């Protein structure tokens, strides 16, 4: 009885072990440490009922266990299991018979000796079977020929020895294997596309990844923009024009009473960074309208008809959210003039279909729907005329570069969250940044803040701003770059020549700063302080040519040699000379414009060979005369040029006030001793 109890307990422990192994396969079950086996001696009379209950409990737990296997893993496990079963089914003799791999020569010898009574031919092997006294021996070798019937020698021996020959069919395992390997690439490809599709749907909200939504618009309903007109500085006239759009979206009845029709479309024209997108957001923010931003290139896709479908979807969504503003950035990507590509092409046809749909949609909504289409581009010359006619983009607003006043306002807006030192004068920064747009000025202040942070300062100083202007305008300074004495002298005379000519020649721009510190691609540079005018006069253009030539003239005069550093100066001087002669008619050839005409397809010249030769001669004559004139000017002021070069080699960076002090007669030492207040009178 005691042995029986021990045996029952061991069975119970084994069941516990099996149960624990099953539980370990369940990912969601807590893994418990395996307890050591213990032999418990109990009496059969007292504990028989308890043992039955424990066994029943274990059975119930086994029934409740569920195997949670991920579908892809489960699929592959089933596939492997089926392949294994088919393999063993097709080769069942391999499970129960011992095989001996022998050579072909040994195989033939055994047939001769009568050791093989049956030969079985498969696809790649010959299997010889010998049955003696109920025992079976199996010999296997590789086939010498594709088919056994082609092996005449072995066939003759087999016939003599009365060997039974059996040709086996293709094993089931081979069929399954072939099927698996045939269809596996297809299934893998389908699984790959399914996986990529799920990923794209997850990352794009189902719009891009779902092939049934391929035509849905990519424009997203933005939260009501919190940008106001007060956040847009330097664009006074542009904001005044757009205030009418805001009033229409907020109070359309006012315009309807007067019988006025508000423009359906507003086209913002301007160079990159001038604030076109910011203006569109400000209109939406002021009018509290839904904002649908989209790029023109997002309409064009690989599939034909997708662009037109997205246009329809975009306008459909906008009508649901009215009042709404649809903003198409870089509209020239989809709104180019039709018919220019004479070679055809699917991409061009798709773009034209998209443009046609856009034109139809802009005609299809009424003004009472309170939907405004705004677009931005810097290539208005390539837009299709149908876009610009009345009833579509019939209001065009030029967003120009800001003037000095506008730049001051922009700097004030972008410096709201920055701490400026007491010496900072934003007016001075605005004066030395002509041509900078809002994006450039924002970047300038950000660079200045980074420079201040490098010095562990929480204030931006005027020095930081001045360095940021150079970095944004010319590139990173290379103060650690080693320059030979000869190169330093050449740079000093080159930049000194520019500065001297700009100071002496009437009509030239004032000098703001001169430096011989390499920055970007330039070995040094002279920064002018140009006056902002509506246009340039002939005198100003000629003075600029003189200043450009002064660098090369300074090298030739003081070093008796010239360098390649004047390449960009000569190129710019040649462009100005051609502008003067062939474009604006300010030469002896008369007020005639000789520019090439653009017929929309290719550039073609209307000039005769004789006229082109006259223009070339006139350009050469003008440039040669201006260079000689500049060389004579520097020769007459050689001592002043030497002083400027000496000061540049001493300080590396010289202000315009110091240059003007040297030209007025001060020595280098006197200028070095001047303080800021004393230099102020030379500003």
From Swiss-Prot:
Periplasmic side: 92-174
Chain intervals for the UniProt region annotation (Disordered): 1-43
Record's bilayer topology term: Multi-pass membrane protein
Subcellular location(s) per record: Cell inner membrane
GO CC aspect terms: plasma membrane
TM regions (residue ranges): 71-91, 175-195
UniProt-annotated binding residues for Zn(2+): 494, 498, 569
The enzyme's E.C. designation: 3.4.24.-
Domain of life (superkingdom): Bacteria
Ranges annotated as biased composition (Acidic residues): 10-28
Cofactor stoichiometry and binding remark: Binds 1 zinc ion per subunit.
Entry coiled-coil feature ranges: none
Biological process, per Gene Ontology: protein catabolic process; proteolysis
CDD domains: RecA-like_FtsH (cd19501)
Binding sites annotated in the UniProt record for ATP: 270-277
Cofactor(s) needed for function: Zn(2+)
Assembly behavior: Homohexamer.
Family annotation (PANTHER family): ATP-DEPENDENT ZINC METALLOPROTEASE YME1L1 (PTHR23076:SF97), METALLOPROTEASE M41 FTSH (PTHR23076)
Record family assignment: In the central section; belongs to the AAA ATPase family.
Identification of the protein by name: ATP-dependent zinc metalloprotease FtsH
Organism: Streptobacillus moniliformis (strain ATCC 14647 / DSM 12112 / NCTC 10651 / 9901)
